[in-house]
Amino acid sequence: VSSLAHIRGRPIIDRGQVFAISHGGMMVSIDLRSGRRIWGKEIGGLSNPWIAGDYIFLLTNDSEVAAISKKSGSIHWVQSLPKFEDPKTKDYPIIWNGPILASDRLIVSSSLGQVLSLSPYDGKILSSLEMSSGISVPPVIAGKTVYFLADNASLVAYR
């Protein structure tokens, strides 16, 4: 882990493996007991990854949601998200938060207030909705409810 710079998301421990991602462009899997690096992948991100089954789901620095194999670090799929509010001029970058997994859907939210649900199996966008305000923090799941804290201090819950 010492070779990783700019770690913003918390490392995740799952079944004897530690997974860490840096904003600087590296994700690694490390054996928890020995400290030996199992694999490394040139991919960067700011948010905490989400682990489910054999995959790690994450947001990349390039506004992509990706599914990566826990075992090998190979990329299973990648889904691009909008990067700019105005794609022609590349003004006003969009900041994405998440992902979280809820009821067979990956959920991400944006600084513009857009919420997307994606298939964890192939990354296809399944649905989209617009909040009344931007969202600057990742959504939270508790029980069967997903909570979003919007920038206008609204707390929105979906089941």
List where the protein language model places each region.
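WD40 beta-propeller blade core
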Residues: 28, 66, 116-117, 156
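Extracytoplasmic beta-rich repeat domains
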Residues: 1-13, 36-53, 78-100, 126-143
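Short loop/turn segments that connect beta-strands within beta-propeller blades
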Residues: 31-34, 69-72, 119-123, 159
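Hydrophilic extracytoplasmic domains
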Residues: 110, 120-159
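Solenoidal tandem-repeat scaffolds enriched in leucines and small polar residues
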Residues: 1-26, 31
